[in-house]
Amino acid sequence: MQQYSSKYNKQAILLVNLGTPDNYDTKSIKRYLKEFLSDPRVIEANPVLWKIILNLIILPIRAKKNVHTYKTVWNKQHNKSPLLFYTENLADKLDKKLDNYIVDYAMRYGNPSIESKIKSLQDQGATEIIIFPLYPQYSATTTATVYDEVYRVLSKLRWQPTIKGINPYYDNKFHIQTISQQIKEHLKKLDSTPDTVLFSFHGLPKEYFDKGDPYYCHCYKTYRLVKEELQNEYPNIDFELSFQSRFGPKKWLEPYTTVKLEEFAKQNKSVVVIAPGFSADCLETLEELAISEKENFIKKGGKEFSLIPCLNDSNQHVDMLYNIIDEEICLKK
């Protein structure tokens, strides 16, 4: 990131993504998962019982199990996870586009932490920080916990910066247009028209939705608005919605991505999958969808499977974020 002197406008924008292990070894993965799965916003359970289950069962098993999956998707050239690599590049590009703002990034779990970046921005003279969680759809498990951590950090500061937040952008016109265009461009590259475009969002325990989390509604609205943008141009394509990455025995939001793909496979359909809830490619897209779900789909009789990459550090993503920020805070040109 660029370093700014006091002559610059003392405003900053902090992009925040979910997080990643520092490396794909067991120790790094275990440390990351412990922080992530210890968040009561993520796992709503009896804290004493959950701590025992997490430390004695889940962490020892999942840390070892995930070494191979993280190694498979790891950007070995830069020795970074894809999520970290793309988020860092995205912030750097947006920083160059916004002359009067310091733009940086942080991870909710792992490194670089929200605390370290808020302190870094203060050291550069920022007295106002705009928090931009890179989650289009709001959930207490994602967006809310970002602000929990921001205000935890602020509670320890004697001189607090002014904090503003960018709203979830699940139905923002710039987001819908960008996702729609992304699908169009991908379809043009294919040799034949697919039977279905499947919108796969990260799942959530259904009880969270029942308690008032609006995540499902936000996902459905993103899906509906993009579908409305495309269905007239592609009348022979079915647009469907599903939820992936189920964890644990509880019922999660349905339909499940695995189940939908198996249904399509039995009908010998060709499928294009997009994961518009992820701002950057990560384990859930590069391994779960691109490898595991694809292999299962083909094995079950599916015809063709194609995954649309996330927006990542593309110029379209940079422009979209710029327009959303400008719309919300009226950027000073």
Curated annotation (Swiss-Prot):
InterPro entries: Ferrochelatase, Ferrochelatase_AS, Ferrochelatase_C, Ferrochelatase_N
Chemical reaction(s) catalysed: heme b + 2 H(+) = protoporphyrin IX + Fe(2+)
Keywords, sorted A to Z: Cytoplasm, Heme biosynthesis, Iron, Lyase, Metal-binding, Porphyrin biosynthesis
Subcellular location(s) per record: Cytoplasm
Binding positions (Fe cation): 202, 284
Entry-linked CDD domains: Ferrochelatase_C, Ferrochelatase_N
Enzyme class: lyase
A Pfam match: Ferrochelatase
GO CC aspect terms: cytoplasm
GO biological process, alphabetically ordered: heme biosynthetic process
Gene3D superfamilies assigned: 3.40.50.1400
Pathway: Porphyrin-containing compound metabolism; protoheme biosynthesis; protoheme from protoporphyrin-IX: step 1/1
EC number, UniProt record: 4.98.1.1
MF GO annotations: ferrochelatase activity; metal ion binding
PANTHER family from the UniProt entry: FERROCHELATASE (PTHR11108), FERROCHELATASE, MITOCHONDRIAL (PTHR11108:SF1)
Its job: Catalyzes the ferrous insertion into protoporphyrin IX.
Family: Belongs to the ferrochelatase family.
Protein name, entry field: Ferrochelatase
Organism: Francisella tularensis subsp. tularensis (strain WY96-3418)
Organism ancestry: Bacteria, Pseudomonadati, Pseudomonadota, Gammaproteobacteria, Thiotrichales
